[in-house]
Swiss-Prot record:
<comment type="function">
    <text>Involved in base excision repair of DNA damaged by oxidation or by mutagenic agents. Acts as a DNA glycosylase that recognizes and removes damaged bases. Has a preference for oxidized purines, such as 7,8-dihydro-8-oxoguanine (8-oxoG). Has AP (apurinic/apyrimidinic) lyase activity and introduces nicks in the DNA strand. Cleaves the DNA backbone by beta-delta elimination to generate a single-strand break at the site of the removed base with both 3'- and 5'-phosphates.</text>
</comment>
<keyword id="KW-0234">DNA repair</keyword>
<dbReference type="GO" id="GO:0034039">
    <property type="term" value="F:8-oxo-7,8-dihydroguanine DNA N-glycosylase activity"/>
</dbReference>
<feature type="active site" description="Proton donor; for delta-elimination activity">
    <location>
        <position position="262"/>
    </location>
</feature>
<keyword id="KW-0238">DNA-binding</keyword>
<dbReference type="Pfam" id="PF01149">
    <property type="entry name" value="Fapy_DNA_glyco"/>
</dbReference>
<keyword id="KW-0227">DNA damage</keyword>
<feature type="active site" description="Proton donor">
    <location>
        <position position="3"/>
    </location>
</feature>
<comment type="subunit">
    <text>Monomer.</text>
</comment>
<keyword id="KW-0456">Lyase</keyword>
<feature type="binding site">
    <location>
        <position position="111"/>
    </location>
    <ligand>
        <name>DNA</name>
    </ligand>
</feature>
<feature type="binding site">
    <location>
        <position position="92"/>
    </location>
    <ligand>
        <name>DNA</name>
    </ligand>
</feature>
<dbReference type="InterPro" id="IPR010663">
    <property type="entry name" value="Znf_FPG/IleRS"/>
</dbReference>
<keyword id="KW-0378">Hydrolase</keyword>
<dbReference type="InterPro" id="IPR012319">
    <property type="entry name" value="FPG_cat"/>
</dbReference>
<feature type="binding site">
    <location>
        <position position="153"/>
    </location>
    <ligand>
        <name>DNA</name>
    </ligand>
</feature>
<keyword id="KW-0862">Zinc</keyword>
Length: 272
């Protein structure tokens, strides 16, 4: 599933091509995504896309009269195409958002876990977004906040990091990578992590996500950016999916454990 860096890469890739453009139409080839796509063509036609922002793993297209909420699901992608290029839709290209000046935003979703929703209220108050915690790349998220949110929690620190009510967008890949940078064993109880180590972990999260965005995200299976190219952050992984390989810092073999429904990867020497 695309995590925060991948969604931010997509946002940056499409924002300049969407902002200021008017919507000319909507083609829905398959409405059966995670939630059925509502009838929106009459509502959207003529509206101008003012801004393209991100909240967690959701993309928000502010159209003035309302906001289009997009989620890429497990394997979705967005591409901004010129109609003149005459690129025929493929099997899993379920939705085209037609724009003025001969452009189209094409939503591809092979596994159909994505979403295209519309709200006329404040987008951040939508039931899918209202519970979300702070954005990790903003000043609202720091070591003090992480320390306060982890007190009296017996769950593992990795599981807590992946709780979107604590902080948004830190999925399995980036939780593993940030914990390595911070030198923290993923199985440690969150409530036992001290203030100093929480500060280091918050900084490691910011650094990891920032580096991933600059590398175009991670492409392990399906992810491609809006230009159709894969990301390259997987080439920089410290621990994720490197079971049995030597730690890039100390040479100790990376180990793998199961936490909930997810695999965790760590260096038993570097992470305590």
């Amino acid at each position: 599933m695309p995590e925060l860096p991948e969604v931010e890469v997509v946002r940056r890739g499409i924002a300049s091509g969407l902002e200021g453009r008017k919507i000319a139409g909507l083609t829905v080839r398959n409405p059966n995504l995670r939630w059925p796509v509502p009838e929106l063509e009459r509502t959207l036609c003529g509206l101008e896309i003012r801004t393209v922002t991100r909240r967690g793993k959701y993309l928000l297209l502010d159209c003035g009269a309302g906001t289009l909420i997009l989620h890429l699901g497990m394997s979705g992608s967005l591409r901004l195409l010129a109609l003149a290029a005459n690129i025929a839709p493929q099997k899993h290209d379920h939705i085209d958002l037609l724009l003025d000046k001969g452009m189209v935003l094409r939503f591809r979703d092979p596994r159909r876990f994505g979403a295209v929703l519309w709200t006329t209220g404040n987008a951040t108050d939508h039931p899918l977004l209202s519970h979300l915690g702070p954005e990790p790349l903003t000043e609202a998220f720091d070591g003090k906040l992480l320390y306060s949110k982890t007190r009296n929690r017996s769950a593992s620190i990795k599981e807590v990091l992946m709780n979107s009510r604590i902080v948004v967008g830190v999925g399995n890949i980036y939780a593993n990578e940030a914990l390595f940078l911070a030198g923290i064993d993923p199985a440690n109880a969150a409530g036992r992590i001290g203030a100093r180590r929480c500060a280091g972990l918050a900084q490691a999260i910011k650094e990891t996500l920032g580096r991933a965005i600059e590398a175009g995200g991670s492409s392990l299976r399906d992810f491609v950016g809006s230009d159709g190219n894969p990301g390259y952050f997987q080439q920089q992984y410290w621990v994720y999916s490197r079971t049995g390989q030597p730690c890039r810092k100390c040479g100790t073999n990376i180990e793998q454990i199961r936490q909930g429904q997810r695999s965790s990867f760590y260096c038993p020497r570097c992470q305590k």
